[in-house]
A protein has these predicted regions:
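Active-site gating loops and adjacent loop-to-helix segments of metal-dependent hydrolytic enzymes
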Residues: 71-82, 126-150, 193-205, 216-229, ...
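Active-site core of metal-dependent hydrolases
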Residues: 148-268
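Active-site loop-to-helix "anion-binding N-cap" substructures in soluble metabolic enzymes
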Residues: 46, 53-59, 82-92, 208-225
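C-terminal cap of metal-dependent C-N hydrolases
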Residues: 4-6, 326, 336-368
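His/Asp/Glu-enriched, well-ordered alpha-helical/loop segment
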Residues: 219-229, 249-258, 263-340, 344-347
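Divalent metal-dependent hydrolysis catalytic cores, especially in the metallo-beta-lactamase
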Residues: 52, 67-96, 111-125, 151-161, ...
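N-terminal metal-binding scaffold of metallo-dependent hydrolase/deaminase domains
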Residues: 1-31, 357
């Protein structure tokens, strides 16, 4: 590749990245400060752990939608992602999981890599559905086992206050499933207990959870006081920049997601979100009653938004690549170093995306 300011695991290097057979062979160059030159930035590819759709398609539509969704998000620098389900009848969830499980075994040319599934519901509080359809129910281990047999479920969002969910958190976290607290009316104490039981993150922090109050800290308070990881939607609509800064100061490995819907990468109009019809307008996606319903955010815009509120480019990149990879326990993605997958994005000095590579493949994203 041409000479760039390359963000490596050890800092900025002015030089070139050499790759072969999809993996990084070497990074040749010298340490630098990007402020001293006008070269482009070469960053690790973005890893989005919360994707419902894009390009007019929704994950819940099944196999026919996946290639469109992954081709849409790669155009904006997402090189790998988790396909995220909606709360739905169990047979519908099973059908989608089976299709995702099969799709994970391949990566069509020109697409982002699907790393697995984020099961967002149905094990959530019906009083905090947000944009989720009303199919929430208490988790049953037999049902979860059926789901796990169909696809690599990496993350499950769960409301810890529901009876029996503490046992599920213990059982599944011990098997490597990341259990996230979300869509919950739980108390501060219930949030802390869930973390002690093995929960490891929070789903779209601040949104669809009991808020912080100085006498009732709620789930938000549990996250700010105790979490190492949490996901946050940095579209500047879901969370005020001031609240974003509070979370960034409090949660060491806060990482950012899009929570993107079918409307991502598309013009204003009506789109599907699970069984709902949502409307994209004024930069957001909403239900008919005005409730925010996922986002239209893309990861390159997430980077620009983080920089806009004051983060250095290196830290913004870390929260879009390295921290999501670390959270999933993935060492071969999310960082540019020898032996890692050659997943990277190039941006000009205005942070406009100019090139994307997935597993060594140059993506023709402008004509996708």
């Amino acid at each position: 590749m041409s000479e760039d300011n390359i963000l490596t695991a050890d800092g900025w290097i002015r030089g070139r990245l050499v790759h072969e057979h999809g993996k990084i062979l070497s990074i040749e160059g010298v340490p630098c400060d990007p402020a001293d030159n006008d070269l482009p930035y070469l960053l690790p590819g973005f890893i989005d752990l919360h994707v419902h759709g894009g390009g007019g398609k929704d994950i819940m539509e099944g196999a026919t939608a996946f290639e469109t969704i992954t081709r849409t998000h790669v155009r904006f620098g997402t090189t790998s992602l988790l396909a995220t389900t909606m709360t739905a009848p169990s047979e519908e969830i099973s059908s989608v999981l089976k299709a995702v499980g099969e799709f994970c075994e391949q990566r069509p040319s020109g697409s982002a890599r699907v790393l697995g599934v984020h099961l967002e519901g149905p094990y959530i509080n019906p009083g905090k559905l947000g944009a989720q359809p009303n199919f929430a129910h208490t988790a049953l281990m037999a049902e979860v086992e059926e789901y796990l047999a169909l696809a690599p479920i990496r993350v499950i969002t769960i409301a810890p206050e529901i009876a029996g969910h503490d046992a599920l958190i213990r059982a599944l976290s011990s098997r490597g499933v990341r259990m996230q607290i979300g869509h919950t009316l739980g108390s501060y104490e219930e949030g802390v207990a869930a973390l002690a039981a093995g929960a490891s993150s929070f789903t779209h922090l601040y949104n669809a959870m009991s808020p912080l109050h100085h006498r009732e800290p709620g789930i938000v308070g549990a996250a700010l006081a105790h979490a190492k990881y949490a996901e946050l939607i940095p579209d500047l609509l879901h969370v005020h920049p001031g609240a974003m800064r509070v979370a960034l100061r409090s949660i060491p490995c806060l990482y950012c997601v899009t929570d993107s819907t079918a409307a991502a990468g598309m013009p204003d109009g009506e789109y599907k979100l699970g069984s709902h019809t949502v409307t994209k307008c004024l930069g957001g996606v909403r239900l008919p009653d005005g409730t925010l319903a996922g986002s239209t955010l893309t990861m390159d815009q997430a980077l620009r938004n983080l920089v806009k509120i004051g983060l250095p480019i290196a830290e913004a990149s870390q929260r879009l690549s390295q921290f999501p990879a670390d959270y999933l326990g993935i060492t071969e993605r999310g960082r540019l170093q020898p032996g890692a997958w050659a997943d990277c994005v190039r941006l000009d000095r205005s942070l406009t995306l100019t090139a994307v590579m997935v597993e060594g493949e140059d993506i023709d994203f402008k004509n996708a």
